[in-house]
Structure formats: C-alpha cells, structure tokens
C-alpha cells in the first residue's frame, strides 16, 4: 500500500509540474507581447524595402514543378482561424519521409478544414529564415475533425517545410520536425489499461519477443526536458510493438489533458526516441459480451479504389459483415468511394494510416480495434478473394470450429495475367482465370481476443495466447484466389513501395531471392515481352463461374459492382 501511495504521489507531482510548465509558458508569452508589437512596426518598414529590392530579383527562373512566388508575399506570422476566431490553426508537427513531408495541422474546434487548393507547401533552405520555393501539396487527408495531414513533396534533403495560406499570404510557423526512421508514431490504451506504442527505429528482428527489462516507456510533453518525464515499465516488446504499463495520472486524466501528452520508448542508457504518439483511449472500457459481427476483414492498401467496390460487394455476398480499411497514403479518391459504400449500407470504415512500411503494426492496430465487435477477422489484401469450392457457406466453415481454434490458415492460389494486356472491364473475378499450379503461403482468419498480448505477427500469421491453436483449412473447403500478377499496367505499381516492415522495396538491389519478389523481374519496372502469358499453369474458372451464377443480373448479365 505504501508503494502504491508513493507511486500516486509521484504521478500527481508530474501532473503539477506539467501544469506549471504550461502556466509558465503562458506567462512568458504574455510578457513578450509588448516587445513583439514594437518590433512589428519596425519590421513593417523593413518589409517595404525588402519588397522593392526583392522585386528586382523576382525574374530568376525556377525549374521542375516548383512554382515561383515572391519571397515577401509570404508573411511569417501566426494565422488566425478561418472562421475569424482568436484561436489559431497551427502546425502540430512535421514528419520527414524519404520523398514527402507530412505536416499535421491542428484546427480549433468547429473550424472548416483547408482544401488542397487553399494552401501551398513552402520551403526553407538550411540556415535561412526566409522561404524560397512553394509547391502544391501532393494530397490532403483528414480523419478527425480537428486534425489534417498535408503531404508535401520533398525533392531536396535538408530543407524545412511549412504551410502558406493563399487567400491572405500568411505562413504558418514551422512546428516540431521529426525524421521517420526513428519515431514513436501511434499509441492507444487497451482494455487492460496498458498502452500499446508503435515505434519505428528500434530495429528489432522479426517474429521475436525481446527482453522488456532492457527498455522503458516514457511519458511527457517535451522529451528534451528530463525533469518533466514519467517513466513506466515495458510489459512486452517485439518488432515495432511495445506494451507499456500506463501511469495512473494518464488513466485518470481527461482526454483534453492527455492529448498533449506523448509516449515513447528508450533502451536502457539510450536516448528517448522522438514521438508523435499520443495515448488515446480508443477502445471501449466495457466491450459487449456478444460480438456484433461473426466475420470482419482488415486490409491495408494504397491507390486500390478501382478494385475495392468489387472486393467489398463480393465478400458481403459470402458473409463478411464489416471492413476495416487502412489507407496507406492513397491519392485516388479512395475516401469518397468508401463514403459511397457506407451510404449503400456496407459497414466499412476508413482509417488514415500514413506510416510507410508498417503493415505488421497496422494489422496489430486493426486487431485491437476489431476485437470488441468481431468474432473473427480476416487479414487479406484487396486483390485476394475468399473462395469456397465446395459451396459450403463461410459461417458454416468457421462456425463449426472448436473453441480452442483461434486461427484458420488459408492457402493462396496465385493468378497471372491470363493472356490479358488491358484491365478487364468486368473486374478481376471474371477477367483472370489462369493460375500457378502450386499453392503459396497462407493468409489467416483469427479470433482477435485470442491473440498473444505482444501482437507480434508476420502479416500472414499472429502469435496466439497459450491454450489456443491454429488449423490449416483444406483447399476444397476454403482457398484464397490471389490475383497477384495482373496486367502490367496494374502490376507495375507494386514497384513503388512494399508495405511490410521486413520486405525490401523491389527497386532496391537486396534480398533478390525473397518470396516477396516476382520471379524473372529485376529492380526496374520494365514489362517483359511475354508478361501477359506468364504464371499460367492451370485454367481455373471455379470462382468466376460461381460469381456469374450467383450475382449476375438475369436481364442485363451485369454484376453488382458494374452498375
């Protein structure tokens, strides 16, 4: 009891320290207001001179996609909210990826969000306080009403990026900037009040549970101020997934207070990894005893809108009841399609997942979100379709399993271009009918509440809790048709970036013998002359015939996703 009381006292002291820090910062801002007003008058005069001097150099040419803009047109000052209130839109943080900068904008409550045409990405050279280039954002994304992700192209290393508002020329102050290769990027609080933290840069081996005593979790607002940090025990750690004991002050704090607290991890005697992860309680304290859905599906995708409608409608017909779509930086208006499907009463949700090469972490995150409503969850891609050759319904197949079975492993049949050179107009199910003879690695359908607490997975399989086991499904009962090698126009997109943590990108000259790579292809997206006839050993029209019989309109012969 004494130890518990001491723990609570230390945590309460942290809350007081953090609160005092906030008050001190507010006082400091108040004291600086007078001097800022005086400086603004001087700065205004200087700005006029800079404008005329700068104008004489404004005709210097810029190459590439960069659009020229007078330096003096961007006013480096805080932006008042769009609605005219005193609250400010701000850059909460920026994360630098290899080819893009992701700028997270924080909005006042109720303020309308910017569109892509409202803003520019504005670039600063190293050691220069003045912007020199601007570009239109690659895309803008939002899931919450008060947070927006602006994706800015990053063609030069070493630059810093902010956001310029076209309507008034205001430039948002640059927020904290972090490198993607070492970052705690996501966190949530589980049913048992532990915090799950997803961390890039630990560089741990795949599929292995590590010694948690060699790490510790760190909570705080500012990880550079060691006296304002709270340490917590690591319960488990493996891959990019860390489970932490959550401090009582975090559990008892309000959501508004906790929104400014971040969590990260450090190895013993090592610095704290930078963080943008805030431990939100996204899961219900009291999940229902009766699951709402027997069968759900999780998927992670990028620019797959063209196939999503077919994938959802087919799986709805065979018994899938809910879809969790993790959008990994799509630019093909996927969100609009998901809204349309939702309006058509498909229980589908989109979750913005901007983090690259984190599919294992994303699936673990999805398993946590799905376990309160789904008895079973399948982890498959949108070019993978569950197929029941015997005609036995999905709910009978999984409903007849014993209670100690927590994972169903399903073989995959890989289909090739099937002689096609253009995208099939009636969809993949009718278009691709020729496949490889030998089946390939499994994909899994799991009971999410039976997963090991480490949440370690290899995309295809999860580690299970003690007492549970997996079964291999017979291929005559259930198999996955994987339309893996489609026409070249579609297939070449796989060269952009692989989504798994431990797979090399196909443009990299490493791990060339990996099963993730395509036989006979190098590191460049160059179409082989015989591509359309490759990977064709067995003509298989089983699923196509089922689909035509079950789903085609008797009058028009059209399929639901063609209407």
Where are these regions (language model features)?
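Short beta-strand-to-loop acidic/aromatic patch adjacent to the donor-nucleotide binding site
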Residues: 325, 374-387, 408
């Amino acid at each position: 009891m004494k130890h518990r009381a001491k723990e609570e006292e230390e945590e309460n002291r942290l809350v007081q320290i953090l609160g005092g820090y906030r008050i001190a910062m507010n006082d400091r801002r108040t004291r600086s207001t007078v001097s800022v007003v005086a400086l603004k008058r001087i700065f205004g005069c200087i700005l006029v001179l800079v404008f005329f001097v700068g104008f004489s150099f404004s005709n210097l040419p810029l190459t590439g996609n960069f659009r020229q803009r007078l330096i003096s047109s961007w006013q480096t000052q805080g932006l008042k909210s769009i609605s005219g209130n005193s609250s400010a839109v701000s850059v909460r943080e920026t994360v630098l990826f290899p080819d893009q900068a992701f700028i997270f904008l924080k909005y006042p409550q109720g303020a309308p969000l910017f569109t892509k045409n409202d803003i520019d990405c504005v670039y600063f050279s190293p050691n220069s306080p003045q912007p020199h280039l601007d570009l239109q954002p690659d895309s803008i994304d939002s899931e919450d009403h008060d947070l927006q992700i602006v994706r800015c192209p990053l063609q030069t290393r070493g630059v810093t990026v902010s956001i310029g508002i076209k309507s008034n020329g205001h430039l948002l102050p640059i927020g904290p900037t972090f490198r993607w290769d070492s970052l705690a990027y996501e966190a949530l609080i589980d049913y048992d009040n532990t915090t799950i933290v997803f961390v890039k840069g630990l560089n741990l081996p795949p599929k292995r549970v590590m010694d948690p005593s060699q790490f510790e979790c760190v909570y705080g607002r500012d990880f550079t101020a060691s006296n304002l940090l709270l340490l917590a025990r690591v319960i488990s750690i493996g891959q990019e997934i860390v489970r932490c004991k959550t401090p009582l002050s975090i559990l008892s704090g309000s959501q508004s207070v906790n929104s400014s607290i971040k969590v990260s991890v450090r190895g013993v005697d090592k610095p704290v990894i930078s963080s943008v992860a805030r431990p939100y309680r996204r899961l219900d304290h009291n999940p229902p005893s009766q699951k709402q859905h027997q069968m759900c599906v999780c998927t992670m995708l990028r620019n797959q809108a063209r196939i999503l409608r077919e994938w959802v409608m087919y799986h709805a017909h065979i018994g899938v009841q809910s879809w969790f779509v993790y959008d990994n930086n799509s630019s093909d208006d996927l969100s609009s399609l998901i809204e349309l499907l939702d309006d058509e009463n498909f229980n589908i949700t989109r979750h913005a997942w901007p983090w690259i090469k984190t599919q294992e972490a994303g699936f673990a995150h999805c398993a946590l979100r799905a376990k309160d409503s789904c008895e079973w969850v399948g982890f498959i891609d949108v070019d993978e379709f569950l197929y029941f050759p015997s005609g036995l319904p999905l709910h009978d197949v999984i409903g007849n399993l014993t209670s100690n079975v927590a994972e169903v492993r399903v073989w995959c049949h890989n289909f090739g271009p099937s002689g096609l050179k253009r995208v099939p107009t009636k969809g993949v199910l009718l278009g691709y009918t020729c496949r490889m003879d030998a089946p390939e690695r499994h994909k899994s359908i799991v009971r999410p509440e039976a997963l090991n607490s480490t949440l370690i997975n290899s995309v295809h399989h999860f580690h299970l809790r003690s007492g549970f086991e997996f079964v291999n499904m017979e291929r005559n009962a259930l198999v996955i048709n994987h339309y893996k090698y489609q026409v070249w126009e579609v297939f070449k997109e796989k060269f952009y970036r692989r989504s798994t943590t431990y797979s090399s990108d196909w443009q990299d000259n490493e791990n060339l013998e990996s099963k993730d790579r395509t036989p006979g292809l190098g590191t460049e997206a160059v179409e082989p002359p015989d591509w359309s006839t490759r990977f064709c050993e067995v003509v298989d029209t089983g699923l196509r015939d089922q689909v035509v019989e079950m789903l085609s309109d008797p009058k028009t012969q059209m399929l639901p996703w063609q209407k």
